[in-house]
């Protein structure tokens, strides 16, 4: 059910605890605070006229002035390419230093849309628990990046490949409980029907797939473990209703791309062995042994010494440590949907509604 603040607000007013009540609603995270400050900055930009739309032939001075609205470190003396590279990194683009089509598109997103993105991401922070496990794995689906936290501090990150807009990776939280070394791939029926069965049995056999009977009398496709398995050499399992997981991949080309939303929904990892080693480091019998286990070519499940929390999140706006805002595209249109819900909710707010639930004031 949607959170209804009116009962607790009425109680806070009656008990003269309004400041404490308001403070309790704010997510206790630097990520949220960075967005809150960013929102104020972008609202100020909007209130002073926003920014003009740039053309591909815009002069260097016009481009520099546009960049300076979001990046206060832009100066008139530094090369324009350096300022463009900073902007491209903030937008998750290839930092060529050129005003290419993707950069132009990002710069021409309206300030109102940037504000809507910030507000949508602030709302997602409100969905988070009040405390996060200090040791955890976080995947930013929109940015296709995995970050490992230990002691509540980021210790390593790697590129990932997340779900395409038509095969979306879900937002969820769970716990990684085990790693499958040299996993076979039990091909989901949706993929088998659309992509594999149409190739014909002979082609599938040549490509190393096996067709096996199901208990119900049907057929399914299995790709045996090995260097060419779609799951690579490692699969990280966690309970969830979407049948998604983290895994290795033999197809490494996408990791050098800045457009990495290309999977069927699971998350492919750039450095799976490094991630596995971090997860088993506290077990002397497993620490440093992941590659040796892979080299046996045997399929085996390794239970983790302790389960590791995993969060699949969708951040399209976030602040750097210096307060500069970063943005990513909204490939699933989740920002757009959430912005519509936020706007609809704000229209439904009745500023007098609290009076209907508040107790009579005491003398």
Language model segments and positions:
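Well-ordered beta-sheet/strand-loop patches within structured domains
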Residues: 3-7, 11, 17-363
